[in-house]
Amino acid sequence: MEGITKSIRYALRKHGRDAALEDLRCFAGPPLVDKFMEVYGVTREEAEQLVTDFRERYVPIGVYESSPFPGIRELLEALRAAGKKTAVATSKPQPLAELLLERAGLRELFDVVVGSGGGVNNDAKWQIVTRAMELCGAKPENCVLVGDTKYDVEGARKCGIPCIGVRWGYAAEGELEAAGALAVAETVEEVKAMIKAGDSK
């Protein structure tokens, strides 16, 4: 989160704006161009320049200001040991998503990584998720999405798959429940238990 908010503020300051880091948490999750337009009322062209400026700091610096939540590696290893396919479906640009996973030492634990620009004509979350399922050869009834924002929950619903929300991410209090998450986990162990429970049905 820190890498994202600091890089958003860096971009804003280049354009004569400023904001407290806590007020910029809303930029974690949705497509940045859309969020800049929504929050600051800028044109698409201005928003695209803000995103360019964001990446000017985020790629060389911001990616090193975050780390995987404790237990994530072990969860992914357990899923793969059980024969599950794993995928990332993110609104981040494909190359940036790959870079973040490599930096975290997690890339080899995912069969598929799909980001915006990764073969998707429209960057809507549900289309990115659909593309990830296609590349995995998976059907909706055999999938579950684990996400930390309402955009994940909404994207999953449009694809006909359940979403397990996680409390340790970017969502505001009550956001995941209001969006319709199947359940909300407080810990990685709870996510693992929920996935296991789904397998038994």
Model-identified regions with their sequence ranges:
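N-terminal helical cap/lid subdomain that shapes the substrate entry/recognition surface
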Residues: 1-74, 80-82, 95
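Conserved H-loop
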Residues: 18, 43, 106-111, 139-140, ...
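A short, structured active-site edge motif that brings together acidic residues
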Residues: 23-25, 52, 107-122
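Glycine-rich phosphate-binding loop signature in dinucleotide/nucleotide-binding domains
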Residues: 81-84, 136-142, 198-199
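Conserved phosphate-coupling serine/threonine residues in phosphotransfer and NTP-handling enzymes
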Residues: 90-92
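Anionic-ligand binding region
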Residues: 98-102, 113-135
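Conserved Lys-Pro-Asp/Glu-containing loop-to-beta segment of HAD-superfamily phosphomonoesterases
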Residues: 123-154
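Acidic, Mg2+-coordinating phosphoryl-transfer loop and its flanking beta/alpha structural elements
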Residues: 144-185
